[in-house]
């Protein structure tokens, strides 16, 4: 199995709900290591740039507004098949359709405020990690 890195964002609803620790525990319990982390309050430019691929979609403005409504926690997770594992832990985009025990089922209130973001492919992970982190902000954890 391949060791991968993926980007995770704990969104404003989950940060505001005081769920950071519980969400981090889920990552670590699944064998993912946190190798980079920071709390940010995104502005329109940073959030809009991150979600630029959705610019023409009808939900884009609401998404940017939500992502700038409060602090987020961006993290780089590392582990075997980290991308798929992280997506499994997150659950379906719509919390109403998410499996029991997933982050979205337990901490999200709607498809619009769904607690977390995760990279959907190796290409996305590489691009998204570079968007928020410089090389020296992502650390090797050998211990």
Curated annotation (Swiss-Prot):
<keyword id="KW-0418">Kinase</keyword>
<dbReference type="GO" id="GO:0006183">
    <property type="term" value="P:GTP biosynthetic process"/>
</dbReference>
<dbReference type="GO" id="GO:0006228">
    <property type="term" value="P:UTP biosynthetic process"/>
</dbReference>
<dbReference type="GO" id="GO:0005737">
    <property type="term" value="C:cytoplasm"/>
</dbReference>
<dbReference type="InterPro" id="IPR034907">
    <property type="entry name" value="NDK-like_dom"/>
</dbReference>
<keyword id="KW-0963">Cytoplasm</keyword>
<keyword id="KW-0597">Phosphoprotein</keyword>
<feature type="binding site">
    <location>
        <position position="114"/>
    </location>
    <ligand>
        <name>ATP</name>
    </ligand>
</feature>
<dbReference type="InterPro" id="IPR036850">
    <property type="entry name" value="NDK-like_dom_sf"/>
</dbReference>
<feature type="binding site">
    <location>
        <position position="59"/>
    </location>
    <ligand>
        <name>ATP</name>
    </ligand>
</feature>
<feature type="binding site">
    <location>
        <position position="11"/>
    </location>
    <ligand>
        <name>ATP</name>
    </ligand>
</feature>
<dbReference type="GO" id="GO:0004550">
    <property type="term" value="F:nucleoside diphosphate kinase activity"/>
</dbReference>
<protein>
    <recommendedName>
        <fullName>Nucleoside diphosphate kinase</fullName>
        <ecNumber>2.7.4.6</ecNumber>
    </recommendedName>
</protein>
<comment type="similarity">
    <text>Belongs to the NDK family.</text>
</comment>
<keyword id="KW-0546">Nucleotide metabolism</keyword>
<comment type="function">
    <text>Major role in the synthesis of nucleoside triphosphates other than ATP. The ATP gamma phosphate is transferred to the NDP beta phosphate via a ping-pong mechanism, using a phosphorylated active-site intermediate.</text>
</comment>
<keyword id="KW-0460">Magnesium</keyword>
<dbReference type="InterPro" id="IPR001564">
    <property type="entry name" value="Nucleoside_diP_kinase"/>
</dbReference>
<keyword id="KW-0547">Nucleotide-binding</keyword>
<keyword id="KW-0808">Transferase</keyword>
<keyword id="KW-0067">ATP-binding</keyword>
<feature type="binding site">
    <location>
        <position position="87"/>
    </location>
    <ligand>
        <name>ATP</name>
    </ligand>
</feature>
<keyword id="KW-0479">Metal-binding</keyword>
<dbReference type="GO" id="GO:0006241">
    <property type="term" value="P:CTP biosynthetic process"/>
</dbReference>
<dbReference type="GO" id="GO:0046872">
    <property type="term" value="F:metal ion binding"/>
</dbReference>
<comment type="subunit">
    <text>Homotetramer.</text>
</comment>
<dbReference type="Pfam" id="PF00334">
    <property type="entry name" value="NDK"/>
</dbReference>
<feature type="binding site">
    <location>
        <position position="93"/>
    </location>
    <ligand>
        <name>ATP</name>
    </ligand>
</feature>
<feature type="active site" description="Pros-phosphohistidine intermediate">
    <location>
        <position position="117"/>
    </location>
</feature>
<dbReference type="GO" id="GO:0005524">
    <property type="term" value="F:ATP binding"/>
</dbReference>
<feature type="binding site">
    <location>
        <position position="104"/>
    </location>
    <ligand>
        <name>ATP</name>
    </ligand>
</feature>
């Amino acid at each position: 199995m391949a060791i991968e890195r993926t980007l995770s964002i704990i969104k404003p609803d989950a940060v505001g709900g005081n769920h950071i620790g519980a969400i981090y525990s889920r990552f670590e319990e699944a064998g993912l290591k946190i190798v980079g982390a920071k709390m940010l309050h995104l502005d329109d430019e940073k959030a809009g740039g991150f979600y630029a691929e959705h610019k023409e979609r009808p939900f884009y403005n609401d998404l940017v507004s939500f992502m700038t409504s409060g602090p987020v926690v961006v993290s780089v997770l590392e582990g075997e098949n980290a991308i798929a594992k992280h997506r499994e832990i997150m659950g379906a985009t719509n919390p109403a359709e998410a499996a029991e025990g997933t982050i979205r089922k337990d901490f999200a209130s709607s498809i619009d405020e769904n607690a977390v973001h995760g990279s959907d492919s190796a290409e996305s992970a590489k691009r998204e990690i570079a968007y928020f982190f410089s090389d020296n902000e992502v650390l090797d954890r050998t211990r």
